[in-house]
Amino acid sequence: MNMRRMLGVGSALLLAMSAGQAMAKEVSIGYVDGWADSVATTNVAAEVIKEKLGYDVKLQAVAAGIMWQGVATGKLDAILSAWLPVTHGEYWAKNKDKVVDFGPNFKDAKIGLIVPEYVKANSIEDLKTDTSFKQKIVGIDAGSGVMIKTEQAIKDYDLTGYKLQASSGAGMTAELGRAYPKQQSIAVTGWVPHWMFAKWKLKFLEDPKGVFGAAETVNSIGSKDLEKKAPEVAAFLKKFQWQSKDEIGEVMLAIQDGAKPEQAAKDWVAKHPERVAEWTAK
């Protein structure tokens, strides 16, 4: 083999190695586009992973069930929107042996039925006799945990005639936004953290039967291969956690006010270097 050919083969090998390394430096993260907290959390994490850890990040917007299926099969490397132990309890039970739980990125999360403070109803039980709601609950995407629990609540509270209207996170808040200034009664499926609590005066309907469960955590879940494939990312996800609903709310409100999620994340990361340092410290 002459020198020129040897150099050519060597160059090809270096290119192949570089390509392999580049491929190994990419991670995919699934999120639910209609969930304000999912969008905010995922984009901030992606910005840190890209800028501080040097990985390319591929974000994939999917439904909740597909999100869990993706991380369980390894088609997704991580998800940061796992509501546990109740909301995504069924998904966890089905997939817990196929994934790695890196712990909560948000504590004191809560789901349930939400109404404006101006309505008389204070409990889910009140919906049975309050005709002002016109036997309708405005929901989000079908198959999400809060929708499954709301279907159960309709049965458990004997809300005969009530219909759960599937929509999206944006569709739900749009209907709420139309009803609120008219002081109309409206019940929606909702959760904390969410920007709508900063925009309107709202309240959770009491849930004496405990259908929606108590406070939850939103966890970061990784595929079985993530720690081997991207150890720095796995280490980051173990430390990544919002301190309060106001902290994540800063990002959610920026997005709601018109900022693109990527830009809102960049702005937040640039504004809070001390928090990023806590998450990425070795």
Task: State each model region's role.
Residues M1-M23:
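Gram-negative bacterial Sec-dependent N-terminal signal peptides
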Residues E26-N43, A64:
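Extracytoplasmic "Venus flytrap"
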Residues W35-A36, K58-G70, L164-E175:
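Short helix-initiation/N-cap motifs at beta->coil->alpha
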Residues A45-G54, T131-L164, A270:
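Ligand-binding cleft/hinge of the Venus flytrap
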Residues L80-N95, R178-K203:
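A ligand-binding cleft/hinge motif common to bilobed small-molecule-binding domains
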Residues K96-G143:
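A conserved helix-loop-strand patch within extracytoplasmic ligand-binding domains
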Residues K110-K120, E216-A230:
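A bilobed periplasmic-binding-protein/Venus flytrap-type ligand-binding module shared by bacterial periplasmic
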Residues S244-K282:
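C-terminal functional modules
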